[in-house]
């Protein structure tokens, strides 16, 4: 029959989908718009049998429609810089809540610390990772760990890092006739992650050109397929939350599809890291330092993503092995002559990609691996402190604080948490010390040897450190600005980011953390007393400082102090905390601030039932079911 002619009651594809068909030959309008195969003709297809073949074909077509919708969306994402995208889909989907429940097995693992976390990480991860679909409806992007699963191979081994970056595929996949995602779309998703997602997660991290900028982050994405896919999926999820103007929000079906893809990639990552940890465990001490650091980075990256997008996730199954590897690499490669941990020694133990044949009187710029190591060491020290507050335990890495997190940086290679998190070292170290104090208090009461005088004496140095730190913030002058000569302008450009955050502003960020620490310490000493003068003054200070912040990314980074101050807020202050969190809009779902608000709301609704003598910060952070990691 000539093209454009109509025939019969519609094509077999539309009949299978129970959709209206315009019966145009050889491809009807519905199939053409959805970019799926149009099965036309008088003869009934063999799969239209009312049985298993018909069901399988129906599922295959649904998956194909989803895949094509994703490709159309990504093509539009690349073409429209103003993010003006509206999509509709004609397919069933799983709701985000159902998907979150399907991944809730992550929380099934015991909260206790494993005896050998690196060796047992794979068994813990088994309980949390769902098996990825291998149906023809699964999108093909990079030649990823999905393909390795299909081939019965290990998704990731230590040796895979030496084989170079993942290959950006084009044309057709070897295992399918479906077209792969165009390379422009793959790179576009990576650029969204580099330009928008990562800066939103870490708004204070602005390394200079001399520090190699963020090139290490691109290297991390190219390190293996899993990292790339997680970043790409996280970019899509972030994009789905960004307000796109009046009446232009993304379609709910598309949001569900993006969420589905993100969960799939996170589950793949768990399986991949599981395989890697097993390989390293079998290699033991023979595993190169660079491989160990990259494994630590992979686990930490997954931890951040899990906590960012999932509620009530069992984050301990990721944090425990990451901290174990941290401890192992420092003890094996990062101790100085006095057996103290040194990031300088550990950093220089990494292999250099730049051959040095002559002696240099000045230090060379960091390599990408050194910059990545510094970032993740900083991040793990911070996450460990936040975890200790949630669990009511001493920080696992507390013995590293004195050497790696000094109050005042000197010429040695020390960590500056301010460069990564916007908060100076002393405030976060104080929070870790308060967690250790809470652990001591609990154990002393259980052992029957608790002394209030001993508690006060242990708390005194912490209180003094907080007072001294706040006083120094008030008296220390701002960082000097570079001179307005041509050389000064050039130096300002390559030594600091041209949009570097002002010293006075980061001082306010540190003040917020410090006042939250004061609240934490007061509760540890006096119990849950919202009318305590010291607590009331600190809550008021936090609230006033929060009013000065207009950046959603910076507000997101303050989830913990917002939650601590909000939980102890007076009823009259509650609307202000709700309003501040509400300014995040849809982006409040991207990160832990929404979780912090849930905790605050539950605490506010439980005021009358809280026992002020036994209730503490760890109790509050666990009030919605499991300890919350607010990072």
UniProtKB/Swiss-Prot annotation:
Pfam families, per the entry: Fungal_trans_2 (PF11951), Zn_clus (PF00172)
Main location, first listed in the record: nucleus
GO cellular component, one term: nucleus
Keywords linked to the UniProt accession: Nucleus
Organism domain of life: Eukaryota
UniProt induction comment: The expression of the dibenzodioxocinones biosynthesis cluster is positively regulated by the transcription factor dibT.
Gene Ontology MF: a single term: zinc ion binding
InterPro entries named among the record's database cross-references: Fun_TF, Zn2-C6_fun-type_DNA-bd_sf, Zn2Cys6_DnaBD
Biased composition (Low complexity): 123-144
DNA-binding region in chain numbering: 11-38
Effects seen without this gene: Completely abolishes the production of pestalotiollide B and significantly decreases the growth rate. Reduces the expresssion of 43 of 48 PKS genes present in Pestalotiopsis microspora.
Region of interest called Disordered, as start-end residue ranges on this chain: 123-148, 469-488
Subcellular location: Nucleus
PANTHER family found in the cross-reference section: PRO1A C6 ZINK-FINGER PROTEIN (PTHR37534:SF20), TRANSCRIPTIONAL ACTIVATOR PROTEIN UGA3 (PTHR37534)
Function comment: Transcription factor; part of the gene cluster that mediates the biosynthesis of pestalotiollide B which is part of dibenzodioxocinones, a novel class of inhibitors against cholesterol ester transfer protein (CEPT). Acts as the key transcription factor within the cluster and positively regulates the expression of the cluster genes and the subsequent production of dibenzodioxocinones such as pestalotiollide B, pestalotiollide C, 1',2'-dehydropenicillide, 3'-methoxy-1',2'-dehydropenicillide and 1',2'-epoxy-3',4'-didehydropenicillide.
Protein name as annotated: Transcription factor dibT
């Amino acid at each position: 029959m000539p093209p454009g002619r109509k025939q019969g009651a519609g094509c077999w594809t539309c009949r299978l989908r129970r959709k209206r068909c315009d019966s145009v030959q050889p491809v009807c309008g519905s199939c053409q718009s959805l970019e799926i195969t149009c099965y036309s003709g008088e003869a009934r297809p063999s799969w239209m049998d009312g049985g298993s073949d018909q069901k399988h074909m129906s599922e295959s077509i649904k998956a194909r429609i989803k895949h094509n919708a994703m490709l159309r969306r990504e093509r539009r994402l690349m073409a429209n810089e103003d993010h003006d995208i509206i999509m509709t889909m004609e397919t069933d989907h799983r709701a985000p809540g159902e998907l979150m429940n399907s991944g809730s097995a992550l929380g099934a693992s015991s909260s206790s610390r494993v005896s050998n976390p690196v060796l047992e990480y794979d068994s813990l991860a088994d309980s949390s990772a769902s098996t990825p679909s291998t149906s023809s409806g699964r999108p093909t992007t990079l030649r990823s760990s999905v393909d390795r699963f299909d081939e019965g191979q290990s998704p990731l081994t230590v040796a895979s890092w030496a084989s170079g970056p993942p290959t950006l595929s084009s044309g057709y996949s070897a295992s399918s006739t479906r077209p792969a995602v165009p390379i422009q779309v793959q790179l576009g998703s990576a650029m969204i992650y580099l330009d928008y997602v990562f800066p939103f997660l870490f708004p204070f991290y602005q390394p200079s050109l001399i520090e190699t900028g963020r090139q290490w982050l691109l290297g991390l994405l190219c390190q293996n397929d899993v990292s790339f896919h997680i970043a790409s999926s996280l970019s899509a999820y972030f994009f789905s939350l960004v307000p796109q103007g009046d009446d232009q929000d993304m379609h709910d079906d598309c949001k569900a599809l993006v969420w589905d893809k993100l969960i799939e990639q996170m589950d793949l990552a768990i399986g991949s890291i599981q395989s890697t940890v097993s390989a390293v465990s079998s290699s033991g001490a023979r595993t190169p330092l660079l491989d160990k650091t990259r494994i630590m980075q992979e686990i930490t990256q997954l931890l951040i993503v899990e906590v960012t997008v999932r509620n009530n996730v069992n984050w301990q199954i990721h944090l425990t092995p990451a901290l174990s590897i941290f401890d192992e690499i420092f003890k094996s490669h990062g101790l100085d002559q006095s057996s103290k941990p040194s990031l300088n020694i550990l950093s220089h133990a990494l292999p250099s990609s730049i051959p040095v044949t002559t002696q240099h009187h000045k230090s060379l710029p960091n390599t990408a691996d050194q910059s990545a190591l510094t970032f993740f060491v900083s991040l793990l020290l911070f996450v460990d402190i936040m975890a200790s507050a949630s669990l009511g335990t001493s920080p696992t890495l507390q013995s590293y604080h004195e050497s790696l997190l000094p109050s005042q940086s000197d010429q040695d290679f020390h960590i500056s948490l301010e460069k990564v998190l916007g908060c100076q070292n002393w405030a976060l170290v104080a929070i870790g010390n308060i967690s250790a104090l809470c652990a001591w208090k609990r154990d002393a009461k259980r052992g029957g040897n608790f002394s209030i005088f001993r508690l006060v004496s242990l708390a005194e140095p912490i209180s003094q450190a907080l007072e001294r730190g706040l006083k120094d913030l008030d008296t220390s002058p701002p960082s000097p600005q570079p001179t307005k000569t041509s050389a000064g302008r050039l130096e300002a450009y390559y030594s600091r980011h041209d949009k570097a955050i002002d010293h006075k502003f980061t001082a306010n960020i540190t003040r917020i953390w410090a006042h939250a620490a004061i609240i934490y310490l007061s509760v540890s000493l006096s119990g849950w007393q919202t009318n305590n003068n010291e607590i009331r003054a600190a809550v008021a200070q936090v609230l006033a400082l929060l009013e000065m912040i207009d950046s959603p990314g910076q507000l997101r980074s303050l989830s913990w102090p917002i939650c601590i101050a909000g939980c102890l807020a007076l009823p009259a202050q509650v609307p202000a905390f709700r309003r501040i969190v509400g300014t995040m809009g849809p982006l409040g779902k991207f990160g832990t601030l929404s979780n912090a608000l849930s905790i605050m709301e539950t605490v506010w609704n439980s005021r009358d039932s809280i026992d002020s003598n036994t209730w503490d910060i760890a109790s509050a952070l666990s009030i919605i079911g499991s300890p919350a990691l607010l990072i």
